């Protein structure tokens, strides 16, 4: 809990974790949208990235899409490979956790026609 005292957390999110990648909302939504389109569904995308839940393998993808959690670096590398993008290109859109807000996520979802994922 020392992180809360020292200011290294933003709403429970560590400011820096090398294994977690926070992407800007506008880029994150587009990236996941392309992944969903290529895979065919959010659950199929979850399976492509290695999520193995039998009930809802797309749950973690949804959490990342909505900005509730960061991309684990290993899953982001799989996403880059799946979409045929260089990981360096994706990492150029890395941001700090506090820059990922509900407002920026809602705006990005609306601009990309993903109203069905709108957070309430």
Residue ranges and their predicted role:
Residues 23, 27-28, 57-60, 75:
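N-terminal positioning helix adjacent to the helix-turn-helix/winged-helix DNA-binding module
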Residues 38, 49-54, 83:
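Core residues of bacterial helix-turn-helix
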Residues 44-50, 79:
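Short alpha-helical "recognition helix" segments of helix-turn-helix
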Residues 50-71, 93:
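Recognition helix of helix-turn-helix/homeodomain-like DNA-binding domains
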